[in-house]
Amino acid sequence: GILIVPQRNPVILAKECATLAKLSGDRFELGIGVGWLEEEFNALGVPWPDRGRRTDEYCEAMQALWSQDKAEYHGRYVDFANAISRPQPTGGSVPIVVGGHSDAAAKRAGRYGTGFFPAKGSDEELTHLFEVVRRSATEAGRNPDAIENTTMVWSPRRESLDRVKQLEDLGVQTYLHVIDAANADAMFDTALQQLVKLQSIAVPAGFPAYDEA
């Protein structure tokens, strides 16, 4: 899922995410977006035109809290010094997957993301967005090859493999296969078989002790 970052308190959100990362054994990823429904922002008292800038600044503020012993950040929307936030995630960061279909989202993924998730788009649109991600990452001094591209596959089962191969050529590494009214019958048996198989081999992981996390 995608969390609408500019609607949250970044200091509290940073602590929540770091805690989830610890409890999950570093399996937690934070999916972020800027939001699309202006009425939500009006109800929360968050200025709609500022949502992109807020998201960028909140990402930077959270990175400071995750990586610095006594964090300091001074921005337009967030300002703190000597802030202590515990626990801190392994490696000083929580993986961030940026959702969106715009150039702004792609640039954000290049600057802050470990992943980029445009849920849909034509081949031409996806190719353009992935190029924007790589260019933005390079400009930010980051490795563009370390950013994983994800998208959805809406095709029926018989067409899925062909579509996956096409997307792989575009630069997609991870796929979410959507089951909807158009392909539910074709996908149900396969999904059920995989769930039965998973049930037979799954072992509950439990929760690690704090000093082991």
Question: Model-found features: residue ranges?
Answer:
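Active-site-adjacent structural elements that line small-molecule/cofactor binding pockets in enzymes
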Residues: 1-213
